[in-house]
C-alpha cells in the first residue's frame, strides 16, 4: 500500500506508475472517493460535536426548551448513525482501491513489458558436451530417478523423486539453509499456509489470488513462498531500531495453482504445483541506502549459491510492466537450461520499500523516537525441483550419470549421482 498523503500530493507520479506497470485502476475515481470520505469524516465530526453540546444543555435547559433539545439530540444521533454507515461503506471501497495502487518503480527500471527486460550481467556460459546431451526428463527416466505413476495419484504437474535424486533434493535444501546461516540469516522452518490477511500484507492478494489454493472449510490458504508468513510475523509490532535489520531464511513447501499456464512446461520439473523453497527476507529501516545495501546482499547470496552449484547464469533488470505492483526494483536470476538453449528464471530479487509494510503494519521506532514503517526485501535462496533440472542437464556425463558439484559432495557423500537399482 502506498502513502495516501503522497498519493494526494503527487497524483501524477502514481498515474505514471499505473501506466508503466500496466495496472487497471482508475486513480481519479479513487481520489474522488477519498475526497468523499474526508467530507463524511468532517460532517460526522460536526454532528458529533453538536450532539455533545446539546446533551450538555439538556439537564440545565428550562422546560419549554428541553423537549426541542431532546428532539434535536435524537435527530443528530440518527444522522450520525447514517453518516457512520456511509463512512464505513466508502472507507471499505477506498481501502480495496488503495490495495491496488502500485509503488512507483525506481528510475533505473526499463519501461515496458517483458520484452523490455535487460540483461545486466552474465556468469559462465553454455556447457560444451562431447556427446549428444539429454534433457532432464530423459536423464531421470534413464536412471530411474522419478516415479511416473505419480500423475495417477496426484494429477498433472506433480513429481516424485527416487534414489540419489531424492537425496540430492534434500541435500540442496540443507545446503541452502546452511549457507544462509553462515551469512547471518536466521534459519526458520515455516507453515505452508496462512490467513488471508498475510496474503494481503505481501500483495499476493488481490493481484494474484488466482495462483493461490484455498483450504476448504477454513480461513487458510496455501503459500507459494515463505515470504507470506515471514512478512506477517511482526505485524502490529513496533520494533526497536537496534533490532534492524531482521534477516530471515525461511524454508517451507510451497504451492501454486499455475492458473493460466495451460500448455507451458508440461513435462518434467520446471513447473509443478508443489515445490520446496528457501526464501531470503529482510526487514530494514526506511532509507534507500539501507534498502540498496540489503538488495545487493540478497542478490550476492543467490549468485554465490549458483557459483557453488557451478551453474551458468545471468542477471536481468526487470522492466516496469513485468515487475509486480509493489516492486521498487526487481532483478531476476536466470540459469541456462541446455535442452531449451536458453536461460530460465530461478530467483527473483525484489525491493518493495514500505509498500508491504503499510499493508502488513510493520513498524519500528527510529533513533529520534518516531514510529515509522519499515522497508522490506526478498529473494529466493534456492527452489527445487526447478534447480534440479538445471543441475541434471548442465552436469550430465556421457554415461547418463550426473556429477555432483564440489560444494554438495559433503552432503551427498559421493561425487556422482548413481542410477536407481
From Swiss-Prot:
NCBIfam families tied to this protein: serS
GO cellular component: cytoplasm
UniProt record, GO biological process: selenocysteine biosynthetic process; seryl-tRNA aminoacylation
InterPro entries: aa-tRNA-synt_IIb, aa-tRNA-synth_II, aa-tRNA-synth_II/BPL/LPL, Ser-tRNA-ligase_type_1, Ser-tRNA-synth_1_N, SerRS_1_N_sf, SerRS_core, tRNA-bd_arm
EC assignment: 6.1.1.11
UniProt-annotated binding residues for ATP: 256-258, 272, 345-348
Compartment(s) where it occurs, according to its Swiss-Prot or TrEMBL record: Cytoplasm
UniProt GO molecular function: ATP binding; identical protein binding; protein homodimerization activity; serine binding; serine-tRNA ligase activity; tRNA binding
Role played: Catalyzes the attachment of serine to tRNA(Ser). Is also probably able to aminoacylate tRNA(Sec) with serine, to form the misacylated tRNA L-seryl-tRNA(Sec), which will be further converted into selenocysteinyl-tRNA(Sec).
Major enzyme class: ligase
Keywords: Aminoacyl-tRNA synthetase, ATP-binding, Cytoplasm, Ligase, Nucleotide-binding, Protein biosynthesis
Protein's UniProt name: Serine--tRNA ligase
Pathway the protein acts in: Aminoacyl-tRNA biosynthesis; selenocysteinyl-tRNA(Sec) biosynthesis; L-seryl-tRNA(Sec) from L-serine and tRNA(Sec): step 1/1
Reactions the enzyme catalyzes: tRNA(Ser) + L-serine + ATP = L-seryl-tRNA(Ser) + AMP + diphosphate + H(+); tRNA(Sec) + L-serine + ATP = L-seryl-tRNA(Sec) + AMP + diphosphate + H(+)
Transmembrane helix in keyword set: no
Domain free text: Consists of two distinct domains, a catalytic core and a N-terminal extension that is involved in tRNA binding.
Coiled coil: none
Binding site for L-serine: 225-227, 279, 380
Keyword field contains Aminoacyl-tRNA synthetase: yes
Recorded superkingdom: Bacteria
Amino acid at each position: 500500500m502506498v502513502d495516501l498523503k503522497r498519493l494526494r500530493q503527487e497524483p501524477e507520479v502514481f498515474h505514471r506508475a499505473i501506466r508503466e506497470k500496466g495496472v487497471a485502476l482508475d486513480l481519479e475515481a479513487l481520489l474522488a472517493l477519498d475526497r468523499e470520505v474526508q467530507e463524511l469524516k468532517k460532517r460526522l465530526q460536526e454532528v458529533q460535536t453538536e450532539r455533545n453540546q446539546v446533551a450538555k444543555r439538556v439537564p440545565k435547559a428550562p422546560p419549554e426548551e428541553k423537549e426541542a433539545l431532546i428532539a434535536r439530540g435524537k435527530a443528530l444521533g440518527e444522522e450520525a448513525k447514517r453518516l457512520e454507515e456511509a463512512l464505513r461503506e466508502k472507507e471499505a471501497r477506498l481501502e480495496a482501491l488503495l490495495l491496488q495502487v502500485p509503488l512507483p518503480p525506481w528510475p533505473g527500471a526499463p519501461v515496458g513489458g517483458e520484452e523490455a527486460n535487460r540483461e545486466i550481467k552474465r556468469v559462465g556460459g553454455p556447457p560444451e558436451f562431447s556427446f549428444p546431451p539429454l534433457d532432464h526428463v530423459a536423464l531421470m527416466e534413464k536412471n530411474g530417478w522419478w516415479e511416473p505413476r505419480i500423475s495417477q495419484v496426484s494429477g498433472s504437474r506433480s513429481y516424485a523423486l527416487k534414489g540419489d535424486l531424492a537425496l540430492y533434493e534434500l541435500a540442496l535444501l540443507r545446503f541452502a539453509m546452511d549457507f544462509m546461516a553462515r551469512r547471518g540469516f536466521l534459519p526458520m522452518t515455516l507453515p505452508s499456509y496462512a490467513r488471508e490477511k498475510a496474503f494481503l500484507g505481501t500483495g499476493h492478494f488481490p493481484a494474484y489470488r488466482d495462483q493461490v489454493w484455498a483450504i476448504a472449510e477454513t480461513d487458510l490458504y496455501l503459500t507459494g513462498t515463505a515470504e507470506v508468513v515471514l512478512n506477517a510475523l511482526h505485524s502490529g509490532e513496533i520494533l526497536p531500531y537496534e533490532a534492524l535489520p531482521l534477516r530471515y531464511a525461511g524454508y517451507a513447501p510451497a504451492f501454486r495453482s499455475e492458473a493460466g499456464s495451460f500448455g507451458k512446461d508440461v513435462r518434467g520439473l520446471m513447473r509443478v504445483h508443489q515445490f520446496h523453497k528457501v526464501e531470503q527476507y529482510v526487514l530494514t529501516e526506511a532509507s534507500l541506502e539501507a534498502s540498496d545495501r540489503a538488495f545487493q546482499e540478497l542478490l550476492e547470496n543467490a549468485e554465490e549459491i549458483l557459483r557453488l552449484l557451478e551453474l551458468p547464469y545471468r542477471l536481468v533488470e526487470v522492466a516496469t510492466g513485468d515487475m509486480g505492483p509493489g516492486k521498487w526494483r526487481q532483478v531476476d536470476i536466470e540459469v541456462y537450461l541446455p535442452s531449451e538453449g536458453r536461460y530460465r528464471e530461478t530467483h527473483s530479487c525484489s525491493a518493495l520499500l514500505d509498500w508491504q509494510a503499510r499493508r502488513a503494519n510493520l513498524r519500528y521506532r527510529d533513533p529520534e523516537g518516531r514510529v515509522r514503517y519499515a522497508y522490506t526485501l526478498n529473494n529466493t535462496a534456492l527452489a527445487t525441483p526447478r534447480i534440479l533440472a538445471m543441475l541434471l542437464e548442465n552436469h550430465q556425463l556421457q554415461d547418463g550419470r550426473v556429477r555432483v558439484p564440489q560444494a554438495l559432495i559433503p552432503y551427498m557423500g559421493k561425487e556422482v549421482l548413481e542410477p536407481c537399482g
